[in-house]
Amino acid sequence: MQYSFTEKKRIRKSFAKRPIVHQVPFLLATQLESFSTFLQADVPGTQRKPEGLQAAFTSVFPIVSHNGFARLEFVSYALSSPAFNIKECQQRGLTYCSALRAKVRLVILDKESPNKPVVKEVKEQEVYMGEIPLMTPTGSFVINGTERVIVSQLHRSPGVFFEHDKGKTHSSGKLLFSARIIPYRGSWLDFEFDPKDILYFRVDRRRKMPVTILLKAIGLTPEQILANFFVFDNFTLMDEGAQLEFVPERLRGEVARFDITDRDGKVIVQKDKRINAKHIRDLEAAKTKFISVPEDYLLGRVLAKNVVDGDTGEVIASANDEVTESVLEKLREAGIKEIQTLYTNDLDQGPYISSTLRVDETTDKTAARIAIYRMMRPGEPPTEEAVEALFNRLFYSEEAYDLSKVGRMKFNRRVGRDEITGPMTLQDDDILATIKILVELRNGKGEVDDIDHLGNRRVRCVGELAENQFRAGLVRVERAVKERLGQAESENLMPHDLINSKPISSAIREFFGSSQLSQFMDQTNPLSEITHKRRVSALGPGGLTRERAGFEVRDVHPTHYGRVCPIETPEGPNIGLINSLALYAHLNEYGFLETPYRKVVDSKVTDQIDYLSAIEEGRYMIAQANAAIDENGQLVDELVSSREAGETMMVTPDRIQYMDVAPSQIVSVAASLIPFLEHDDANRALMGSNMQRQAVPCLRPEKPVVGTGIERTCAVDSGTTVQAFRGGVVDYVDAGRIVIRVNDDEAVAGEVGVDIYNLIKYTRSNQNTNINQRPIVKMGDKVSRGDVLADGASTDLGELALGQNMLIAFMPWNGYNFEDSILISEKVVADDRYTSIHIEELNVVARDTKLGPEEITRDISNLAEVQLGRLDESGIVYIGAEVEAGDVLVGKVTPKGETQLTPEEKLLRAIFGEKASDVKDTSLRVPSGMSGTVIDVQVFTREGIQRDKRAQQIIDDELKRYRLDLNDQLRIVEGDAFQRLARMLVGKVANGGPKKLAKGTKIDQAYLEDLDHYHWFDIRLADDEAAAQLEAIKNSIEEKRHQFDLAFEEKRKKLTQGDELPPGVLKMVKVYLAVKRRLQPGDKMAGRHGNKGVVSKIVPIEDMPYMADGRPADVVLNPLGVPSRMNVGQVLEVHLGWAAKGLGWRIGEMLQRQAKIEEMRAFLTKIYNDSGRKEDLESFTDDEILELAKNLREGVPFATPVFDGATEEEMGKMLDLAFPDDIAEQLGMNPSKNQVRLYDGRTGEMFERRVTLGYMHYLKLHHLVDDKMHARSTGPYSLVTQQPLGGKAQFGGQRFGEMEVWALEAYGASYVLQEMLTVKSDDVNGRTKVYENLVKGDHVIDAGMPESFNVLVKEIRSLGIDIDLDRN
């Protein structure tokens, strides 16, 4: 088995019972693949597939002028490389994007030859089409300097859907069936039955009309309509009665209204008897062709065709007329013998279309189309052209209507056609097929669709959403171009004169900046980033709304299995509408979610893996991943638990066709990180999944001792860690950069064989948490491609580490852990276990005001030198300064308006030239309740404005860092080149050279070492080929130097050019403060099983319960939090964590007594290979075993994968191994070694019962009491009511509401109440009075009229009611 460089350092012991058949796919693949398909940036213009940008262009171009003599054609598009890289965009507040240029061709035809087109002239040109934001390698976008994510949308797939109203519309509870044709874009077409069984249609949810109007509009006559939906009964009229052509099936189940006889007159069915199968057999045996029927059998039937008098050509009766006595009389008079009527019955052949034709008042195609026009455009006169144009535009025009590839495939599948391709507009037979199926449904044949089935909902990813916006922009451009194309020839215009890119840019900008699906990235920790990018939302444009979404849409559907996680979804109004992709889920070409299965043939599981969509899956019998199989892959059990079309059942192995690939297949990333998930209640698992995303990265991340094995995948795929692009040797490492000399076989010829990784140091995330990368390699380490070189936030040796492993005791402790409160030892705080760093960004801008420019300066009047002590000469705070609330960070003054001066002030000013009062101090200060250390300052200056010293210094530092990188690359390049050169030169014969090298001398190593490297190139070689090689190496080094100088100049130019700032802004300063947050009472914490709580008290270490060996617990939790919540997983985690730590202590003890390496190897083999997945420790060298052991001292990390975790028996084995009997006895353990005797820290007495004790991975969540604590003495007041504002952000007061007033009234505390409602709130005069009284030392309250009462009086007056106060 292959272990990567980092995996070898610390192997996670897995308890999985099943081998890995299918690796977890790259977790951000959906986002990255979708966007690369959209751009197709690396594909040459001519070879691009018709999708993404290419599809948008080809759908709008060519644009033809109104007169048809000029057209604009699209040739290809190209994307330029972005001006700034991702980091620069984030610092400068820019969008990371690329300019899109399209090559278009203007073709002008000759007007002189209207018959056949003759090209007069062709102009081709590249036109700028706006900026397209680019995706970062981690699947996000940088928009205006902040990282955003475009969430995928789950929407109803285009196609045709049949449903009924579940009997809710009509009071009788009758099922009303309906059908809806949904295109990708264009008008929706609905068909619906009303309670009277008449079929209507409506377009775009407008007024409904009988469906036969639509059928006539597409060109069918009433006869054709009836022929399409009914079978006919044929009658031959006799002088009395008639002969009916006998069709046995149509008579079954009916009641005979007369005696039915055979040819000889023998009665087979008596009158009023129901016709059954025996009667039909008798009639068939008698070879009956016709049945004689009496006259009244014909009455009430409906004619299927127009009946025309052969002689006169007069229509005697029309199709769909009822047969009456008078009609029969007319028919006999005209000598008509044969007539056809519609065959209907009450059971499975209703007269719906016939009834609808009766309601329909239109007569022909034109009338029908006019009726549709009137419905769509009420009040407009229906001219012939307008009517035709509107009808064709509705469903037949490619510009206005697009069913899309998916829609056509779904439509054809639903109506039972074999081919899945076809035209993208609606065809006449599509409409007919839909109505036929709907009528059949009403007749009781077939099934309605389930709209929550994942075969009927598809995912729209970033690429598709962006393409739709881009197309919308292009369509706006198209309108403008059409107008101008007519003048193209006369005014001699070029393509760039025709195309204005503004509409495209604004459409794209609006989408990425403010669409509901473009969200501010959740960056609290790596897991929250990954989850955000894998999120699937049913909300957003074209989706559902929270208020309208019912219960069914939100519920878990059987087709979610392996596609969408049934656990992870937000609590609250969005529950079930926002979901997360399952671990292995994948999108197919149509946008439907697929999940992988292993193929099973003749009850033998093969290695073939097929991805099935929800529709395909319904056709197969699928076994679960935990079905027992032998070593040959044969299914062993007599009955296997399996699923078919959403139903679970036990079947024999020979019926199984597929099998799940992994037990974790059904859950998302966050849920698969919960160990023992199978023992937790679903609601708590949901909370656990959601709370892991809120874990704040700790100062020193610590891997979970009990994990699930997915931690490494998660950390690596999130992009938080630094991975090696190419293998090689670590050449240099410090805290900020890693330099790797690439292996020869991986380096491309002629390029620098150096990879430099600049680490991210103390950077602010979107949620103000700290992103910091730490190298985990040493100089000289050999690394391969994909190895982890540096840990990021919340990762430890390349594994996700969201919290800390805490020693947890489940016991009550003086009521301090009542109701989920958490008791924590002071040692945890002292060791900085949960200390986190939060980075706050504070901005100040200097604007150009009407009264003059604002100035950033140190020269501020009325400020003491103490307050200015931390500012440099430019007025900006030093890096490293420790600041408190209220301290000045950036000094800034704003010009004040000229005030009217008193004569005395004028005199003083004239004498002293006092000018300082013209400006007011508007410096940037640290907000209330914040303190920290300044870690970075950025200064941005507008083009053409003099840079201050500080800004210049920042630029110089940046250039110095860049030069260092280039020098490193050059050093390695030259080092390699000179090594190659030395190998080549030694032993060669020289024709002369420096240091008097004689002709014909053989060059040796000593001579070269004595010579300066650059003088080697002056050696003249006898061998021409070698001389040429020497020259080539010299040229390549000089070329590299030239390239590096160019790169440096490029960087300098970027840094020294002015910054793009908003209008009116001259200078902007950003100050970054690092705030250290220690754990304190009021902080929210949680485990991974939904067991959340608030820290109630931090207890001195000596008061905590402790074990017999003196080791105190870190955390005390209430045992009552477990049984009612049913998340027993936390208890199992504690047991297994206890074993993991115990094993670590045993390894530590071996290292301390310097045990033999064989003993160590044997012990590790026992741990890793006694049960669960086997590890290949044989391949480790002794040094590697030793390093592994050192890393295991803090606990052997375990992996217990979801639904395939450690059993009770395995946990028992591990506990026995970790705590041999002598240690167990000393600690007072119970026989199963999962409970321990504890002693009270305050009294030293032993607790009555043993306590469950062990290690749990515990997280600190992003709800910190520091962000919530807030107090106000005086502050801002609301303008109208004059009451204090509310909330921390406004520095508001505490609301004393209605109920609180009742409480004081109940106590009769009238003076307290008066004070609360007047001087402490909105009695303006009273407030000032109180202040005056306090200054005088007189503690008296003069309460007046509350301002809000005056507001009330004014409001009453505004209603026209005169209200006055009588003062007495």
UniProtKB/Swiss-Prot annotation:
**What name does this protein carry?**
DNA-directed RNA polymerase subunit beta
* Recorded GO CC terms: DNA-directed RNA polymerase complex
Pfam families in the cross-refs: RNA_pol_Rpb2_1, RNA_pol_Rpb2_2, RNA_pol_Rpb2_3, RNA_pol_Rpb2_45, RNA_pol_Rpb2_6, RNA_pol_Rpb2_7
Q: Which GO terms describe its molecular function?
A: DNA binding; DNA-directed RNA polymerase activity; ribonucleoside binding
Protein source organism: Burkholderia ambifaria (strain MC40-6)
Provide the catalytic activity annotation: RNA(n) + a ribonucleoside 5'-triphosphate = RNA(n+1) + diphosphate
What is the annotated role of this protein in its UniProt record?
DNA-dependent RNA polymerase catalyzes the transcription of DNA into RNA using the four ribonucleoside triphosphates as substrates.
HAMAP family, alphabetically?
RNApol_bact_RpoB
